[in-house]
């Protein structure tokens, strides 16, 4: 298909999965802006073999220098302190390591002086400075 045919089809079928790379959701574009990584480098519909991509978008995708990794957590058991992480990122290494687990310190420490006295204290300090200088 030519670029004109792709745009004509996708203009009338914006919800088609093959057109999602041309017309992504606003949330996808926002994630791309926040991560400073263009959405077309990692967005799944852009990687589909049947995706409708104009020549300019194909050229931009070819410049993406991204290693797309899928990392999933397997058996997470706190009682045995065992964490099984499966990394599918062009490597065959699967490591299972024992990790020492301890509870977080959840002790609440209150400030020495209540915060509501801060503006009054600053006002008193300003008056003292003005009175003596």
UniProtKB/Swiss-Prot annotation:
Pfam families: Pox_G9-A16. InterPro entries: Pox_virus_G9/A16 (IPR004251). It comes from the Viruses. The keyword Transmembrane helix applies. GO terms for cellular component: membrane; viral envelope; virion membrane. One of its GO terms (biological process) is membrane fusion involved in viral entry into host cell. It is a single-pass membrane protein. The chain crosses the membrane at residues 112-132. Coiled coil: none annotated. Keywords: Fusion of virus membrane with host membrane, Membrane, Signal-anchor, Transmembrane, Transmembrane helix, Viral envelope protein, Viral penetration into host cytoplasm, Virion, Virus entry into host cell. It is found in: Virion membrane. Part of a stable entry-fusion complex (EFC) which is at least composed of proteins OPG143, OPG147, OPG155, OPG086, OPG094, OPG107, OPG104, and OPG099. Formation of the viral membrane is necessary for the assembly of the complex. Envelope protein part of the entry-fusion complex responsible for the virus membrane fusion with host cell membrane during virus entry. Also plays a role in cell-cell fusion (syncytium formation). Belongs to the orthopoxvirus OPG104 family. This is Protein OPG104. It comes from Monkeypox virus.
């Amino acid at each position: 298909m030519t670029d004109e045919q792709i745009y004509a089809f996708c203009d009338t079928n914006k919800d088609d999965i093959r057109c999602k790379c041309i017309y992504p959701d606003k949330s996808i574009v926002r994630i791309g802006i926040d991560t400073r990584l263009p959405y077309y480098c990692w967005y799944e519909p852009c990687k589909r073999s049947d995706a409708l991509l104009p020549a300019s978008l194909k050229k931009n995708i070819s410049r993406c220098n991204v290693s797309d990794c899928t990392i999933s957590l397997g058996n997470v058991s706190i009682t045995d302190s065992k964490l099984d992480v499966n990394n599918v990122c062009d490597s065959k290494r699967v490591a299972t390591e024992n990790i020492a687990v301890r509870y977080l310190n959840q002790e609440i420490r209150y400030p020495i002086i209540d915060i509501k006295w801060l503006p009054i204290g600053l006002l008193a300090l300003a008056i003292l400075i003005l009175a003596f200088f």
